[in-house]
Amino acid sequence: MENQNQVKRNLKQRHITMIALGGTIGTGLFLTSGATISQAGPWGAVLAYCFIGIMVYFVMTSLGEMATYLPTSGSFSDYGGRYVDPAFGFALGWNYWLNGAITIAVDLTTAGLITQFWFPHLPSWIFSGIATVLIFIINVMAVGAFGETEYWLSTIKVITIVLFLAIGLLTIFGVLGQGNVDVVANLTAGNHGFVGGISGFVGVLLIAGFSFQGTEMLGITAGESEDPGKTIPKAMNSIFWRILLFYIFSIIVIAAIINFKDPRLLNPSSTAVMSPFTIVFKNIGFAVAASVMNAVILTSVISSANSVMYASTRILYSLGQEKGAPKFFGRTAKNGIPFYALLATTIICFIAFLTGIFGTQIYLFLIDLSSLTGFLAWLGISVSHIRFRRAYIAQGKKLEDLPYKAKWFPFGPIVALLMTGAIAINLDPAMLFSEHWGEGLALYAAIPIFIVLYFGYKWKYNTKIIPLEEVDLSREK
């Protein structure tokens, strides 16, 4: 294993676009979207995705400005350490690595759940294990080969969603399905399409947030992009709107064809979980198409895990380079792959997905925990951007010299900061006093863990919040 210490800039714009799409469109859309409909009703789910979508847009513009100015595989972990406080960057890095490990575990568990459609009598963990080995092999390849693989996997995913939307619309308007679907009744079920009122809406925000996680991979791919100054802004503009429209239209189609009370939708009491995409085809009488759709969804979930593995590995690699983790994590193989970081992430994920054996309650807890750590990452991006822009102005630099300028500053990052903070704090306190108190305690632990990482590093290295005039605005890593 050769320590070359540098990843390689072999990712083209189409790779970057599809890696971010692939990392975002996966379990969140193909399985957990059913949970938002089940718990908040059709329009409660749509409203939750719109709410989170606005917040994510502001986060994306903040990240885009920093990523084009200073492309690095450490992304917002590096930005937090450079523009705020080294301790802040350290905490962000480990938080995001934890987020990635949990997210991959969720995706791998999802892969096992999806295979139950064909093999209901076999343990789901067998297929989760096979998927783990597969994504490890893909990530061992040189980054160019990885990018090409993810490009085609994500292309299949996008085509699938477009076909699903087309068939769904034909069903809604009565062309398909032989009139078996009562669209009006499904969309107005509950309290005019809402279930649980405000609490139902707030309760699914974490799940909706989980669905949008992966958009921040755009910043991480900048470190291996051929021309980040041009590719990142173009990719960012196309990625966000594609993701938002895919989610909103898919939720509406699913809610129109499936009643929110359908027991096959993901919820804490589910015993036989099925993708809402597969349920749609079964409901309109396309049994063969349902099986094909399930197979495509399986590849999509593996694609999502594949992208997140890429991002998590790069974050751990960056921590190793910056002495925030053992040095060997900052080493690369001859093909530029941070092998030790990849191996460590795979081992953690392999252990974590076993928790999926204990049922949908634990599975939903993992989704919430993954979402919460993701919200902390988005919060960190917003804080870093505010500090970056203030330092940029304080040091007399011209805004027109920025490769990409966030349009809504300072409104955008401030709103994103307030929204992420409010959602992260406004979890479900009642869980701490219910039979699921252990899961509630573990979920809330994500915030104190971040705080301990921050102040622990601060205490050990005696760091401070960097004065604006002293912030390092050089464009070299």
From Swiss-Prot:
Transmembrane spans: 16-36, 40-60, 86-106, 126-146, 156-176, 192-212, 238-258, 284-304, 337-359, 364-386, 408-428, 437-457
Originating organism: Lactococcus lactis subsp. cremoris (strain MG1363)
Disruption phenotype: Deletion of the gene leads to strong reduction of histidine uptake.
InterPro entries named among the record's database cross-references: AA-permease/SLC12A_dom (IPR004841), Amino_acid_permease_CS (IPR004840), APC_YAT (IPR050524)
Entry membrane topology: Multi-pass membrane protein
Localization: Cell membrane
Annotated gene: hisP
This protein's GO CC annotations: plasma membrane
Keywords noted in UniProt: Amino-acid transport, Cell membrane, Membrane, Transmembrane, Transmembrane helix, Transport
MF-aspect GO terms: amino acid transmembrane transporter activity
Protein family according to the UniProt entry: Belongs to the amino acid-polyamine-organocation (APC) superfamily. Amino acid transporter (AAT) (TC 2.A.3.1) family.
Pfam families: AA_permease
Keyword Signal: no
Protein name: Histidine permease HisP
Function noted in UniProt: Involved in histidine uptake. Has low affinity for arginine and lysine. Plays no significant role in the excretion of accumulated histidine.
Main subcellular location of this protein, as a coarse class: membrane
